[in-house]
Amino acid sequence: LAPMDRSSDPLFDYVGGYDYCLAQLQNMASQSQHNVGDVSSAAYTVPATLAELALAYEASPSTRLVAGSTDLALDITHGLKSIDRLIDITGVAELQCIEQRDHQIHIGAGVSLSAVEAFCQQPLPIMSDLLGRFASRQVRNRATLVGNIANSSPIADMPPLLLVLDAQLILQRGSKQRILALKEFNLGYK
């Protein structure tokens, strides 16, 4: 293979490469007809405890709960969703836990896919292997397993394995908790 001739490609003009790229991006942005969803006026809450989370959600049950926000961010940037209120659960320490108890793996709603991948290497290598193939490392560092389930996408990667494993969800609203089999969680198309 012959080396690529970069002399006529302004992207590889190392003297002005950065300026060229920046100018191109600014030009694309100014000509864009892309309708980006507006979240500038959204109320944003970051509770520190489960009790604070319960109070914030009880005050506004239509609020969107978020952790990684990877799918939500796509919907917003594509203008598909408008968000009025967000509760970010990443500040709730109780939801950042992952542990093995009684031959079960308990994964909090705020645990990233990368953390699940690392944790499951010994107790559940098939899950670790699957997560290693899931999206990019950047997405796995932000996205959560619970978000992948809650998003209810028909093309979500994790639910098939979780269904085979008879996964269960611990759902909580206020002080009330219940356990629900994953197979009973999604009742229809997203």
Describe the residue ranges of each PLM region.
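C-terminal structural segment of proteins
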Residues: L1-K190
